[in-house]
Amino acid sequence: IGSKLFILANGDLYAYDKEDTSIRTYSKSFPLSDTEISYIAYQSAYKSLVIIYSNANIDLLVNEEDIYNLPDYKNKNMTQDKTINHACFYKEYTYLSTASGILCINLKKREISNYYPLNKNVLACNVSDNHLYAATSEGLFAGLLTENLLDIKNWKKVSDDTSEFLSQYHDIPFKGEVPENITPNSPVRNYPYYMNFAGERLLITGGGHIANRLDRPGTIMTFENNTWNSFQEEGISEQTKHRYDDINCIVQDPKDIAHHFAASAGEGIYEFKDGKFINWYSMHNSPLESAVPNEPWADSYVRVNGLIYDKENNLWMVSCETQHAVSVLMKNGDWVSLHYPEIVKASNFGRTIFDKRGWLWATSSRIESGGLFCLNYNGTIADTSDDQHRFITRFTNQDGALLEQLAVYCIAEDKEGVIWIGTNRGPLVLNNPSRYFNDNFYCTQIKVPRNDDSGLADFLLVNEAINAIAIDGANRKWIGTASNGIYLISADGMETIHHFTEENSPLLSNSIVSIAIHPRTGEVFIGTGKGLVSYQSDATEAENSFKESNVRAYPNPVRPDYS
């Protein structure tokens, strides 16, 4: 299109300018209306790029800037498959081949004008000699444009063989000698399973596992100073002789910003320097253990997660269903393996934090055996005789109600030292975490008054599965749910300030998997099941003074009608 080449890759749209070699990315944040693009086609006379989404939504991108959404086909009440396979152009019309017919769009009016139901999977279509031809899985059909093509009787089968037709309208000749890679400044994959800030550098891994592996390519990305970078992937499997995928988390060395460790869902941990792989720790060269030590595939079940440094620069980690579920790589290179009987059978250990007291907390997300583990090692890592530790699988709330079958997905400590955990039963609050080892310890389910003169209240986000919680500079809670978008909750949990969903905002998906907040700017990075989006919040970390560089007036990229 002019000097620009529009590229569809992995469901995302880019424009590459051949003159200045710049790359522009298009997204739901601006200007697109949806995510997961499956097909694009361009009509030059009306300067319209037709954008088809996997959910059958349709956009028209006109003059490279203006977007017109045509959602009627996506919203149409029909039992047939709505998949769109192909587009062709004739005069002011675009004909879209679908899994059950042909959809006609008027580009001049920018509206859907007709739908011709053929009750067949139309692979491609074209107009010739005043006939609309449809190549289907049952042969080639044709309809005269001057007739009523809404009536299926006006479509005639003209051939059983569609191969020549499909070859003519699907094959694209290739010209050129040397291919050129075009790499946009963007994430290498839409897998923001884990996110965390190390200073002002955003660290992201692709994940992950639940009960089983997700089989995602080993993905580690960083975002800093508006630049995306990726860690080495190629060659790691060849060096370790094992698969390299499902990276659960990453941690940056507090003493060396170029030094990182990453944990996997089955192969132990990987060490990187300047983004390059330098070492691998497995059951064969470290005390890390397998969940199935006696099986032939034992070295693919070294399930490590929760990498975190303590204040002394020792690297802690947790592993699933092992005799020594807590391991520490000391700053001098020695290993310490810790045995706590109550977590030997704990599954899906995930997120970890060190609280203000220096206690270690670790979440376990398997409903049948999940819970929250806390360890006070009293400053003596190798000596467990003075340790306090407890694994709670059934919490009691402030009313004495027992919360069973609890899966704990995430954890965060707020500015007041209160600990918030996200569970399959909603958020739970530990107002007095120092009493966690007491037999009478209880959690709090926040009660939000209905304010309808009934005197009744509801538990905050009760029975919502909470995948992520992050605390912003104003001590507010950003809470990401598994299927209902993201909430911004007041510091005390009593007020919902915002509730963003894919329906009322540029949020890519209602399935939130991770949240991280930039410590200086307050920008909220939200990992979803369809990729990453950010929101410029109005709360930043406290600074010593107000100055132009750290204060922004009402920063809000979300349009006013979304609030």
Model-derived segments and their meaning:
Residues 4-7, 48-51, 93-96, 131-134, ...:
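Conserved beta-propeller blade signature
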Residues 36-39, 83-85, 184-194, 243-250, ...:
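Signature of short aromatic-glycine-proline-rich micro-motifs recurring in repeat-based ectodomains
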Residues 2, 42-46, 89-91, 127-129, ...:
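Residue-level detector of Asp-centered blade-edge/turn motifs that repeat once per structural unit
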Residues 254, 544-563:
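Surface-exposed, proline-anchored Ser/Thr-rich loop/turn motifs
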Residues 64-67, 145-150, 226-228, 274-279, ...:
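Short loop/turn segments immediately following beta-strands, especially the blade-tip
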Residues 27-33, 71-79, 155-186, 229-243, ...:
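Surface-exposed loop and turn segments in beta-propeller and other repeat-based domains
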Residues 426, 511-546:
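Blade-level signature of beta-propeller repeat domains, shared across WD40, Kelch, NHL, RCC1
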Residues 14, 56-58, 101-103, 139-141, ...:
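Short glycine/acidic-enriched loop and turn motifs that connect beta-strands
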